[in-house]
Amino acid sequence: LMLTEDGGRVVQPHPQFRMVATGNTVGQGDEYGMYQGARPQSMAMIDRFTIWVNVPYLDKKQRDDLLKSKVPLLKDNQREQLNQYVGEHLEAFTTSKVLQPISPRGMLSLGDTIVNFCTLFNNKDAVNEALEAVILDRCTQQDRAVLKGIVNRIFS
């Protein structure tokens, strides 16, 4: 690092210094409109990162293990249905059928909300209300129609 304000003094990094950055668009912006707010990065910035790794979405077993460990009060059938829903939601996202992704954090939030709503509603209504509150209420009308179709198929 060169500090031009300090007479061009060079600060050497610690030998164990590492930096990791994440990004959904590999710094290229978002030509398909799938990541709102994404902006292209300059090639000078991108050139500073020498190793690029593509990290896929969690697979079904990984999602199941995560739900078991983080939302232990979720009933087995709810967990299985939620896992299936997330898989189909991700498939719809990766094939550009919907613009809204679902992250592991979103999946866990949905699981927690289902558990909490089970104290207020019967099982089916708890799931539907949780899906509305966590996922569907923030969707575009087009995404909502596609995701509601997935919800109706899995949770009916």
PLM feature spans:
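C-terminal regulatory/interaction module of P-loop NTP-utilizing enzymes
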Residues: 1-156
